[in-house]
């Protein structure tokens, strides 16, 4: 029994187990999370994370206990049933969309202290709510009666009342609730307990009987389940649900045309227009409102709405709005507007490119008097690097070859890209503020310098590669006529050249960006060399062999 209850109660089992992190390539700038993942056989490709939507379940100590301090059998069964239903929902019912995952997580965190999903609680709460829905449905019936002109005199009276509210808003809005309480609640109740005498001259005698009360006062209570009011509330709830459904669908139909960036050009245009309107409204509406006679305008709009809601006028307007002619005119106007927007906003920002940095680490062995390769790491392993400060072995945080390095999460290597050896180590040493190192300008190695000024036992050099942002959805396609361009506001942050050669080739040098280069070959710290023009299979010896030979000679 203990193992069964642990299955239901221990919702965060093994959640605190430490995960194994992967090595990541360091990017040129720390502001962008673009570190490349470096993997080897003993390192997992991704760390395991606990499910963020899984909340902790209440412990048994928080449940009602029977005499003796232990939970009763009925409480245990109820707890297990509720937890089982919750777990089944989590496993079997996925989120409706990817954007809803965060919303679901926040809602689950907010509802952590609330009761779990239960059929009994749902049924009880629904019955309690339905027994108290009489007043809202009566108000809705009155509104429908007014707009349908069931009693024209009543509707005209409401129109005059609306006019009076517009003319004297503060007096009317502060007095109407009090008048309603006096003449719609208290007076009918007084007439009920002081029942008027019937008369043959009037249908309803409004003169209360004199003397003490003739009836007991009736205080409104929730209607019982077996009553006509309860059934009427249930029927009205069933029918009025469609009002919210239609309102929701109509609102979504309007917003999906521009608010969700289904077409970036159209949504960008509406965003700019709405931003300008909101800004002008915030800054100048108090001055602009003085130039408009608001009260006559509101009165005309209100009376026009009431007149348009008359059954005969409403039928004519709805027929006109839903006609094929109106639909074609609206479609023509919207199509012309969208075509003009697409014509002027056909330029889109180029796909993001980033430069990934990896350091090749070598260690000097005095007994052999030679440098032995250690591996490739995202850490430069200098004297003040994080690995050296925490006394971690570089062998455990590196891989043996560049081919084992993976791009950062949600990124992918650029097509036909190669690893490039950086031939200007002074630049990245200064950019990363690396201290106590010595730069060999001939071999391009950066050596450790001990505090006494002697060379240390480690050296490193930097390799770079370019990656592009991965498309998370395969169905994304660019619209016809769109042109990718580099954002001019970000162009200043790009470096104009990378000094390096590709792995396995001596063809290299200082490569610069030109007008003929593709716009998407811009990186965060410069233009990636045009690796398509570099012969990776050339017959020259590799740069690694050359630098090692020079170093041995020195």
Curated annotation (Swiss-Prot):
Top-level taxon: Eukaryota
Bilayer topology term: Multi-pass membrane protein
A single GO BP: ER-dependent peroxisome organization
Coiled coil start-end: none
Segments on the Cytoplasmic side according to the record's topology features: 1-145, 194-264, 309-554
Keyword Transmembrane included in the entry's annotation: yes
InterPro entries named in the record: Peroxisomal_Membrane_PEX28-32 (IPR052816), TECPR1-like_DysF (IPR010482)
Intervals, Peroxisomal compartment: 167-172, 286-287
Alphabetic keyword roster: Membrane, Peroxisome, Peroxisome biogenesis, Transmembrane, Transmembrane helix
Region (Disordered): 11-73, 500-532
One Gene Ontology cellular component: peroxisomal membrane
Biased composition (Low complexity): 55-64
Pfam families on file: Pex24p
Compartments reported by the entry: Peroxisome membrane
Regions crossing the membrane: 146-166, 173-193, 265-285, 288-308
Ranges of compositional bias, category Polar residues: 11-22, 43-53
Other information: Present with 5040 molecules/cell.
Stated family: Belongs to the PEX28-32 family. PEX29 subfamily.
Name used for this protein in its record: Peroxisomal membrane protein PEX29
Primary gene name: PEX29
């Amino acid at each position: 029994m203990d193992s069964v209850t642990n299955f239901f109660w221990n919702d965060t089992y093994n959640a605190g187990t430490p995960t194994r992190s992967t090595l990541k390539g360091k990017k040129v700038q720390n502001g962008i999370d673009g570190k490349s993942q470096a993997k080897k056989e003993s390192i997992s490709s991704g760390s395991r994370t606990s499910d963020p939507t899984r909340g902790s379940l209440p412990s048994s100590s928080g449940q009602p206990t029977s005499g003796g301090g232990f939970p009763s059998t009925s409480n245990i069964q109820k707890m297990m049933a509720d937890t089982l239903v919750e777990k089944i929902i989590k496993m079997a019912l996925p989120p409706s969309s990817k954007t809803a995952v965060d919303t679901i997580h926040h809602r689950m965190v907010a509802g952590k202290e609330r009761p779990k999903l239960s059929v009994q609680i749902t049924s009880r709460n629904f019955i309690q709510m339905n027994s108290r829905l009489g007043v809202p449905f009566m108000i809705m019936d009155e509104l429908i009666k007014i707009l349908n002109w069931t009693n024209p005199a009543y509707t005209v009276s409401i129109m005059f009342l609306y006019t009076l509210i517009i003319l004297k808003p503060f007096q009317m809005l502060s007095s109407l609730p009090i008048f309603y309480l006096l003449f719609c609640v208290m007076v009918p109740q007084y007439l009920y307990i002081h029942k008027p005498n019937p008369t043959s001259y009037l249908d309803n005698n409004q003169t209360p009987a004199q003397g003490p009360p003739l009836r007991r006062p009736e205080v409104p209570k929730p209607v019982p389940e077996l009553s006509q009011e309860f059934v009427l509330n249930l029927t009205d709830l069933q029918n009025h649900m469609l009002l919210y459904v239609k309102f929701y669908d109509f609102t979504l139909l309007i917003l999906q045309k521009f608010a969700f960036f289904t077409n970036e050009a159209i949504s960008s245009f509406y965003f700019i227009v709405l931003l300008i309107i909101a800004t002008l409204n915030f800054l100048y509406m108090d001055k602009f409102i003085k130039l408009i006679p608001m009260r006559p305008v509101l009165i005309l709009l209100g009376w026009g709405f009431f007149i348009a809601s008359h059954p005969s006028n409403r039928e004519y307007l709805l027929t006109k709005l839903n006609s094929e002619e109106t639909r074609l005119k609206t479609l023509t106007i919207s199509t012309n507007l969208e075509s003009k927007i697409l014509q002027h906003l056909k330029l889109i920002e180029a796909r993001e490119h980033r430069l990934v940095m990896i350091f090749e680490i070598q260690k000097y062995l005095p007994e052999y008097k030679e440098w032995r390769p250690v591996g490739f790491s995202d850490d430069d392993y200098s004297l003040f690097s994080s690995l050296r400060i925490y006394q971690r072995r570089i062998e455990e945080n590196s891989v043996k070859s560049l081919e084992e390095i993976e791009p950062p999460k949600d990124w992918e290597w650029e097509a036909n890209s190669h690893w490039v050896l950086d031939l200007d180590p002074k630049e990245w040493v200064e950019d990363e503020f690396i201290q106590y190192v010595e730069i060999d300008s001939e071999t391009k190695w950066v050596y450790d310098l001990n505090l006494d000024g002697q060379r240390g036992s480690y050296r490193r050099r930097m390799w770079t590669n370019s990656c592009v942002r991965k498309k998370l959805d395969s169905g994304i396609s660019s619209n016809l006529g769109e042109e990718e361009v580099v954002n001019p506001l970000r162009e200043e942050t790009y470096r104009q050249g990378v000094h390096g050669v590709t792995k396995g080739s001596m063809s290299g040098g200082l490569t610069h960006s030109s007008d003929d280069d593709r716009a998407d070959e811009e990186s965060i710290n410069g233009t990636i060399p045009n690796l398509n023009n570099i012969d990776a299979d050339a017959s020259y010896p590799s740069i690694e062999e050359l630098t090692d030979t020079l170093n041995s000679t020195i």
